[in-house]
């Protein structure tokens, strides 16, 4: 990834990791950031840590709880099963935020469709897209 995940999260003051879900590859800069924050878990063994941060490469998300922060990095196809839009609706709650870091492709149409029901600010830094979302009434 061209930009450090940790630097992006820090820039947007994502400092509370009590309810956070991370999708995507975890590179060394991201690993360092989460280790420094005291919340690093092995992305290959998410079941071993039920506390604050879950790193998932692929998983059935239907039974997951709600997360305040959802971070998507690089690949929006990690959901599988073609239910990305419903999953995003379930993960984003009123007051929730989602940060999308995409260096490989634009946001898929079904994700854009979900985001139409949210107010969001978009900042672009090179190839990185960051959206802070709040559900509309």
Please report, for each region that a protein language model flagged, where it lies by residue.
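A short acidic, Gly/Pro-enriched loop at the edge of an enzyme's catalytic core
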Residues: 56-71
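A short glycine-rich, Lys/Arg-flanked "PGG" loop and its adjoining helix->strand segment in the class I
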Residues: 81-97
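Core SAM-dependent methyltransferase catalytic element
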Residues: 118-137
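Conserved SAM-binding loop of SAM-dependent methyltransferases across substrates and taxa
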Residues: 26-39
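A short SAM/SAH-binding and catalytic strip from SAM-dependent methyltransferases
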Residues: 68-82
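Conserved alpha-helix/loop element of class I SAM-dependent methyltransferases that forms part
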Residues: 1-18, 29
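Short alpha-helix
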Residues: 105-118, 129
């Amino acid at each position: 990834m061209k930009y450090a995940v940790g630097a992006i999260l820090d820039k947007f003051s994502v400092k509370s990791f009590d309810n956070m879900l991370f999708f995507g590859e975890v590179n060394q800069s991201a690993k360092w950031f989460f280790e420094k924050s005291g919340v690093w878990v092995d992305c290959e063994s998410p079941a071993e840590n039920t506390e604050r941060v879950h790193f998932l490469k692929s998983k059935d998300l239907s039974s997951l709880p709600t997360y305040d922060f959802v971070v998507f990095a690089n690949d929006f196809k990690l959901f599988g099963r073609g239910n990305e839009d419903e999953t995003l609706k379930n993960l984003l709650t009123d007051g929730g935020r989602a940060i999308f870091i995409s260096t490989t492709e634009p946001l898929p149409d079904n994700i854009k469709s979900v985001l139409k029901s949210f107010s969001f600010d978009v900042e672009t830094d090179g190839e990185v897209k960051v959206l802070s979302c709040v559900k509309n009434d």
